[in-house]
Amino acid sequence: KINKLDYRLGISLTRFYYNQSGNDDSSKKYSVNPKATLHYTFSDNSYLRWKAEVFNATPSLSDLSAIEQTIDSFQIRRGNPNLKSYMCYRTELTYEWKKGIFYSNLWGAYDYRPNAIMDEKLQEDNKIVQTWDNQKDWQKLSGRLMLRVGPLWDMLQLSFTGGVNHYMSHGNNYSHTYTNWYYEGQASFNYKRFSLFWQINTNWNNFWGETLSGGENIQMLAVYYKHKNLRAGVGAFNPFTDNYKVQSENWNKFASYKTNNYIKESSRMFLVNFSYNFSFGRSFKTAQRKVNNSDNDLSLIHIS
């Protein structure tokens, strides 16, 4: 620690070895994975934290398999035994400020993965071959802002989170960019033994290679009652909407697709919850010391 600056350095070693049955060729690789964290405290109300790490990603056994699988009369899935492990570089920056009932958190990150193993589709005669290869690179820029206020009158708390993910996927035979905006809102109200909770979030989508994997857009409303060790509640998913969907897309030039999965039954789907806290053995009451001669709290708050 240097004045208000805390730092942490780490390093690890990874060994990857692969040998396919019936094949004399094998693959072995070592990688050094460093990690660093810097944390600067401006005051009791704010700090700035920077993190960076390098780690190794290895191909899965299914991707390495040379076996061909027939999907249908036009498509074949084929593994690639020549896949190589690759390095991943990630850095992120977080700024946090809080004062009284107000709290804010601003976060940004950048991911860079050269030679990333990603999907691709090739045309061979009258067939479409789906396989994997070490592509040029995959990059992701992310940003997120969280605002929270509460508790107001010791009863109400509100929070809002908005963010964006920008993907850049560069293959050997393709190049795609995709931007996904998302938000999440929460509200909770507590009065005596009752509590009311509401949450809404939009789709958080992921893009890798040529494939878009969609997240969920969902709302939830629930009310709970607590009496001693008993807690009971009733709630509903999507109580005000019926537009739940999960999308999936592939942007390949030979065999693209776009699907949207709708579940109308998720609209106004009710749930009931009961829980009881059982306690066994002795129970002890603890009191906080008024004077603490040591200070081990770095005021680190981890948000994922």
Each language-model region and where it sits:
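Exposed, low-structure sequence patches enriched in small/polar residues
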Residues: K1-S304
